[in-house]
């Protein structure tokens, strides 16, 4: 059983459009031991109409008079920025990931820079044309499921299955999506190439709306690897997700919660990121394989902690064993206490001093041994 939890340190737009800050975030994620650093790739003109309203959390954390278009345009990373950041991540030994929000950005990531894994954000899960192009461009997909019903997740997976298993000349149709989803080839492609992330799309996410049990629902419904994209304060909900079996954890982080920008307040700082990685690794190791058996370190303690049958007082050879002259005491390398009732009423074959281990040879049946 693989105990390694894949941790994505989500830089998102917390670089505020500053290349040096973005590079520093890569350093922080690498030093923390995260598996990947993830950014967001977009062109404002392709993503947001100029009259699109801000989300409530964006209004709370940014200039109220500024449009959503103007807000995100300041957070764009250029093609040159991407080139520098990908090289820096490679130098630091951490995987570079990014979420594309438009076709231009998808092409940039997969064709220009050769990214094999694409993260699909919750907001794009009903964007069927985009999903299809992602399936045809990416080797692997991480799909966030915030704001989704189970039916919407299945619909998105159907589009991905179609894209994975048909030639680019195939004409997209809903019926064909569904056929691809239920086909053996489609299911195999989904299992091999897709990871689902449970998510609550609110910043920060209220604890009573997290619903970690939905990870189990996703796993049972679709038979795919499942993880958790965490927008709650702190790291404890991420750790709870790891304990519930999440194979991937995605968590927003920032260099400073007090920086201006839409996501800083809902992000953890570097010390918390380090703690998240360390404790996730420890929990992953602690999960084990589920087989109940003594561990390697426990074997040396068995005889120390367990008990054996011993003489409660001097017992003469030929004397009858009774409840008064038998007792169970440590160490546990002698006659098992499970043989207690078999010995009662039997005669001692030798003389026993007080606290002396009762010989296994006393047992007529010798059914149980402590070894």
Where are these regions (language model features)?
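Catalytic cores and adjacent flexible loops of soluble metabolic enzymes
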Residues: 1-371
């Amino acid at each position: 059983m693989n105990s390694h939890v894949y941790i994505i340190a989500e830089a998102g737009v917390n670089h505020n459009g500053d290349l040096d800050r973005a590079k520093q975030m890569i350093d922080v994620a690498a030093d923390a031991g995260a598996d990947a650093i993830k950014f967001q790739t977009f062109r404002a003109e392709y993503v947001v109409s100029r009259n699109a309203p801000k989300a409530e959390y964006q209004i709370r954390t940014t200039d109220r008079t500024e449009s959503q278009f103007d807000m995100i345009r300041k957070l764009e990373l250029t093609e040159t920025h991407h080139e520098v950041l990908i090289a820096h991540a490679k130098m630091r030994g951490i995987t570079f990931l990014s979420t594309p929000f438009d076709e231009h950005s998808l092409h940039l990531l997969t064709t220009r820079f050769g990214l094999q894994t694409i993260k699909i954000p919750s907001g794009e899960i009903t964007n069927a044309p985009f999903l299809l192009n992602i399936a045809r461009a990416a080797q692997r997909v991480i799909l966030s499921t915030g704001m989704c019903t189970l039916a919407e997740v299945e619909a998105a997976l159907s589009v991905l299955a179609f894209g994975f298993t048909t030639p680019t000349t195939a004409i997209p149709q809903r019926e064909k999506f569904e056929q691809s989803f239920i086909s053996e080839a489609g299911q195999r492609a989904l299992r091999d190439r897709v990871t689902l992330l449970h998510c609550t799309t609110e910043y920060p996410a209220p604890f009573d709306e997290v619903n970690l049990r939905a990870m189990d629902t996703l796993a049972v419904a679709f038979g795919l690897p499942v993880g958790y994209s965490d927008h709650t304060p702190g790291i404890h909900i991420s750790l709870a997700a790891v304990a519930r079996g999440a194979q991937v954890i995605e968590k927003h982080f920032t260099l400073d919660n007090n920086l201006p920008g839409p996501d800083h307040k809902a992000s953890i700082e570097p010390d918390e990121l380090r703690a998240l990685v360390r404790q996730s690794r420890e929990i992953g190791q602690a999960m084990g394989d589920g087989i109940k058996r003594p561990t390697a370190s426990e074997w040396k303690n068995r005889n120390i902690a367990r008990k054996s049958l011993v003489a409660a007082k001097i017992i003469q050879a030929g004397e009858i064993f009774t409840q008064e002259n038998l007792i169970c005491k440590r160490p546990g390398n002698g006659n098992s206490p499970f043989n207690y009732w078999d010995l009662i009423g039997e005669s001692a074959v030798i003389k026993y001093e007080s606290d002396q281990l009762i010989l296994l040879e006393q047992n007529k049946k010798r059914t149980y041994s402590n070894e």
